[in-house]
Regions:
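Short, polar/acidic, helix-capping and beta-turn segments at strand->helix junctions
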Residues: 1-152
Length: 152
């Protein structure tokens, strides 16, 4: 099954690339690696704001991470023209806007990791990962994620 067939079976339509909010580009490709800039959580077209542990639950954070993963695939599609060219997701880095006592950043980030495995399969979707708790994310978003993918 192609990546697009899988997305369609999940009822997912890839979004267009969002305009950068500052002085950066959405992606850079060097050789067979594509580096995607951080994408923030959005809900109903607006920034999904808040802090984990202070009004945003772990489950909501996980949903936000999944939403970001969908946005990341929209950008990756724009970068390479065909998601079936993805050989693997290499690395995911997640910044979780959280209070100092919140310790479930890894569970929040599973929202993206599990989505990539679902779409690309257990081998291509498996990746190295970091999940950080931070005091703030741009525009007050609850989660920001960046991605590195290998294409061929």
């Amino acid at each position: 099954m192609s990546v697009y067939d899988k997305l369609s079976s999940l009822g997912i339509t890839l979004p267009p690339v969002a305009a950068p909010a500052a002085a950066y580009v959405p992606f850079v490709q060097t050789g067979n690696l594509v580096f995607l800039s951080g994408h923030i959580a959005k809900k109903d077209g607006k920034v999904w704001a808040g802090q984990l542990g202070a009004g945003i639950s772990t489950e909501e954070g996980k949903q936000a991470a999944r939403a970001i993963a969908i946005d990341l695939l929209g950008t990756l599609h724009a970068a390479v023209g065909d998601l079936n060219k993805v050989k693997r997701i290499v690395k995911v880095m997640s910044l979780v806007n959280s209070v100092g006592t919140f310790t479930e950043q890894h569970l929040v980030t599973n929202g993206a990791s599990e989505f990539f495995a679902e779409v690309f399969g257990p081998e291509k979707g498996a990746h190295a990962r970091s999940a950080f708790g931070v005091a703030q994310v741009p525009m007050g978003a609850c989660v920001e994620i960046e991605l590195i993918a290998e294409v061929g």
